[in-house]
């Protein structure tokens, strides 16, 4: 009897995860809620004075992030996943010079990780189909953009001003992700 219940629970979990990943409306809602939480957490991080923003540079943000563009649902998911991975990677660097709360950063990383976990099964399926155009266009541009952000942090030795500049970039990225969630529909 116990094994039958256990088997039913395992099957239910497997099918519910698959079913949930297919409900794009639910995914869109959950992503938006999580992104709002990310914005709130980023806003709680103290930023330094305005003079730090004078130290910013052109990180060569892809045009697709700067201006409104139409995305297919699949392309939006691939781009969202890529952006989330890069933001996660940046926030795992040495931010000790910033005075930022480790708790806030941990909560932010949890939100980002949760979002990536929700997108990953769909992202893998899309990648297997290989009919997406984003691999040839925006994804390499994203890689270069985030590489430039990382190089900037390293060249500034992760100082407080550099992190302020990157914080502004990440807030812009989260706004871009919010726009992208609009393309994730059933």
UniProtKB/Swiss-Prot annotation:
Extent of the signal sequence: 1-21
GO CC term (a single one): extracellular space
Compartments, record wording: Secreted
Disulfide bonds: 52-161
InterPro entries membership: 4_helix_cytokine-like_core, Interferon_alpha/beta/delta
An individual GO BP term: humoral immune response
Main subcellular location of this protein, as a coarse class: secreted
Keyword Metal-binding annotated: no
Origin: domain of life: Eukaryota
Glycosylated residues, chain numbering: 131, 173
Function, as annotated: Type I interferon cytokine that plays a key role in the innate immune response to infection, developing tumors and other inflammatory stimuli. Signals via binding to high-affinity (IFNAR2) and low-affinity (IFNAR1) heterodimeric receptor, activating the canonical Jak-STAT signaling pathway resulting in transcriptional activation or repression of interferon-regulated genes that encode the effectors of the interferon response, such as antiviral proteins, regulators of cell proliferation and differentiation, and immunoregulatory proteins.
The family this protein is said to belong to: Belongs to the alpha/beta interferon family.
Name of the molecule in the record: Interferon beta
